[in-house]
């Protein structure tokens, strides 16, 4: 770090951890806030304001590396908090979390309701939220927690059947390949374009109260199977869409239906500009 950097940086500048990931890279490129992209091996924030995107992204790691979710979502996060606190007496930490923390519960999910996460990913994300709240109370720091819906959009390099399954299936439809949908795709999700995520994050960072939790999604329940079938029809795809039983492990770690109550963020003036549709999915080509 340049010795004069801390003296010259704008007090509003945000240090972005996870700046090369799907959402983090979009935030660095398109946020209206001044930002500094932290390198992968850096754990000490260059500024008093932090936004933290680093994390695992699905519930399947337990089958191959049972410690990964703990190491990434908890240990590394705490290392960043502690290293940054030694440099800055005041910190404002924004943790980007996930709707997965809600787990089994009434929908639409509200920020105030009890969380009951199911899989290792979900549990460690919720634990990170609680650790952040406790850490900030212990050391007199400030936080925000943002629970995202299912994010879609261009630039996601880690698409798979486990993570961002919607775009994984869209790609197969584009190639006229068959797709398998659990229970015919009769599941509900809350999809939000990454462009709207960046806009929502900016609003929260600049207009919201500190020490609060915000849902960031469309607030619209979307039937995934219906959406995919409409897309296949409108694009004249030759894909066969098959229905299959949901694997037991999937039912253990995920809920069937989920979407977010977005009243709180809408009170800041947030509106969706790119709702999910066949057209916004075509734009991913």
Summary of predicted features, one role per range:
Residues 17, 53-54, 93-99, 103, ...:
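SDR active-site strand-loop-helix element
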Residues 41-72:
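NAD(P)H-binding glycine-rich loop region in Rossmannoid oxidoreductase-like domains
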Residues 78-120:
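Conserved Rossmann-fold NAD(P)-dependent oxidoreductase catalytic core, especially the SDR/UDP-sugar
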Residues 175-177, 181-285:
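C-terminal substrate-binding subdomain of Rossmann-fold SDR/epimerase-dehydratase oxidoreductases
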Residues 60-68, 104-108, 157-158:
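Conserved catalytic-core motifs of eukaryotic protein kinase domains, centered on the activation segment
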Residues 3-31:
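N-terminal Rossmann NAD(P)H-binding glycine-rich loop of SDR-like oxidoreductase domains
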Residues 124-127:
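Active-site helix of classical SDR
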Residues 133-188, 194-199, 203, 230-232:
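NAD(P)-dependent short-chain dehydrogenase/reductase
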